[in-house]
Design a protein with these regions (language model features):
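Short Pro/Gly-enriched beta-strand edge/turn motifs at strand-loop
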Residues: 37-39, 49-54, 153-156
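Extreme N-terminal tail/first-helix region
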Residues: 3, 10-49, 191
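Short beta-strand segments
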Residues: 50-87
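Short, intrinsically disordered, mixed-charge
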Residues: 48, 88, 96-101, 148-155
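A generic structural signal for short beta-strands and their flanking turns/coil linkers
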Residues: 51-53, 66, 77-79, 97-101, ...
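Short, structured patches in soluble enzyme cores that scaffold and shape functional sites
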Residues: 57-59, 85, 105-107, 175-177
Length: 191
């Protein structure tokens, strides 16, 4: 039974013969709740440490994923990502017809081995966000976006003007919800 939006329930989908875990607000949550990252400082660590965001879009019912450099800001308690690229292309065409998207970032990936094949794996932090994408047209927002992107990618502040941002497209991705995960190294890893 769900009492508030932080409670969980398990739902059986007979047609798929499997169970799904769902938050009471309707969002699917991760199976390994012991690995879920909920502390904002840890989530910020993931966002600040990762350099590549994988942008997932849907093109005529088919998945389309593209790796991109990114920047992010918090606006009105919403996480907003910015990515940039050419002024024309497939991803812009897709966003114009279907703005639904997801993003994925990982960092601190460290492979480890074991005595048997099933003990091999990777320690990592990961972030998955779900929301909508839109193409930014306003020069001032493009300047803000490019500044955020360069700060994450280089740790430096750069000056932009309308002429510089007029030659790139900027995509704004507003996350409606997200999850983050940490898979630690095993107790006695063979690294």
């Amino acid at each position: 039974m769900c009492y508030d939006k932080t409670d969980y329930r398990i739902i059986r989908y007979p047609e798929k013969k499997k169970w799904k875990y769902q938050r009471c607000d309707g969002r699917i949550y991760m199976r390994r709740r012991d690995r879920e990252v909920t502390e904002l400082n840890e989530i910020i660590h993931i966002l600040d440490s990762g350099k590549v965001l994988h942008l997932g879009l849907v093109d005529q019912g088919k998945p389309y994923i593209v790796p991109m450099n990114y920047g992010y800001v918090m606006e009105n308690d919403k996480l907003v990502f910015y990515v940039h690229g050419a002024l024309e292309g497939r991803k812009l065409d897709i966003i114009r017809s279907n703005s639904d998207c997801c993003v994925q970032i990982e960092c601190d990936v460290q492979p480890f081995s074991g005595k048997v094949a099933c003990q091999y794996g990777c320690s990592y932090y990961s972030f998955d966000g779900f929301g909508t994408a839109e193409i930014v047209e306003a020069p001032q927002e493009k300047i803000k976006a490019m500044s955020a992107l360069m700060k994450i990618q280089t740790g430096k502040d750069f000056e932009f003007n309308e002429r510089l941002v007029s030659i790139v497209s900027v995509i704004r991705i507003e996350c409606d919800y997200y999850t983050a995960k940490y898979r630690p190294l095993p107790a006695n890893p063979v690294v």
